[in-house]
């Protein structure tokens, strides 16, 4: 009886962290944007899925190819691509959920994994990007003094620590699964009585998962600019290490401004100003859009690999050559076949 009563309460989506039920004030105004979600989320999620699988799948293939020189940068980028690919694999299920009018058909366990995967990907991506930028900065400023910090072994250890911390800190999201509301099975939702806990979780995630990495990136960017202003740049341009460090941090900051900061900002505003019966449709829709942008970071990260990766372009060309060996063979076989034809005619 108690569970049935709680299922009738307004709910808040775990992944969007936004009201997901229908609330009514004195004027009986409908406070839901289910139609907007149904039209927006499926197509956006499927686009992200297509490009994300293409970009990250190819990137992982390139990173795993044997190469004469491997660096810690490639280790961080490989882990980032794996994180993105794991998250992207859940997007078709999310698209199906909203296409069915927020009706979940894939079972309780899969429902619990949805929210968990979103936040594990988001914050592991943030920390992989941050650590990658810091390592690039240290390699530029102290290329020989900090070799132990930028070694491949240290990179794998640091990646393992990031995975463990992010997965452990997000474990509480596995508490909430699917819930039957009449003929509809809801997913990605928490009951309203957990709003205080949700606000606390949001503040912790905002500070530790967004603001701290953002300030770290900003400081690295300013220090790199300071170093470049002191260094005499030759006519050939910046040194390779300087250029790659600057490119890495600039692309990472762009991803932060586009994907992570808008979502964390609007999520915080939405949670702190939300009240039962108070409709804020524009803020609600804006939050939905920023959530999609946060998910789209999985599509933007391959650009970082291409423009700032260590030997990524050379590795990509080498991998593509391996995928098309027939061209090299036909150049050698064709003259032989012509000669054989001439011999048979004689």
Swiss-Prot record:
Alphabetical UniProt keywords: Cell membrane, Disulfide bond, G-protein coupled receptor, Glycoprotein, Membrane, Receptor, Transducer, Transmembrane, Transmembrane helix
Tissue: Widely expressed, with highest levels in the heart, placenta, spleen, peripheral blood leukocytes and adrenal gland. In lung, expressed in the interstitial macrophages, and slightly in smooth muscle cells.
GO molecular function per UniProt: cysteinyl leukotriene receptor activity; G protein-coupled peptide receptor activity; leukotriene receptor activity
Glycosylation sites: 20, 26, 30, 181
A Pfam family the protein falls into: 7tm_1
PROSITE patterns reported for this sequence: G_PROTEIN_RECEP_F1_2
Principal location listed in the UniProt entry: membrane
Topology feature Extracellular, residues: 1-42, 94-123, 175-204, 267-286
Gene Ontology CC: one annotated term: plasma membrane
Any one GO biological process: immune response
Gene3D superfamilies: Rhodopsin 7-helix transmembrane proteins
TM ranges: 43-63, 73-93, 124-144, 154-174, 205-225, 246-266, 287-307
Regions of this protein lying in the Cytoplasmic compartment: 64-72, 145-153, 226-245, 308-346
Compartments where located: Cell membrane
Disulphide bridges, residue numbers: 111-187
Membrane topology listed for this record: Multi-pass membrane protein
Family to which the UniProt record says this protein belongs: Belongs to the G-protein coupled receptor 1 family.
Function: Receptor for cysteinyl leukotrienes. The response is mediated via a G-protein that activates a phosphatidylinositol-calcium second messenger system. Stimulation by BAY u9773, a partial agonist, induces specific contractions of pulmonary veins and might also have an indirect role in the relaxation of the pulmonary vascular endothelium. The rank order of affinities for the leukotrienes is LTC4 = LTD4 >> LTE4.
Name by which UniProt lists this protein: Cysteinyl leukotriene receptor 2
Species assigned in the record: Homo sapiens
Protein encoded by which gene: CYSLTR2
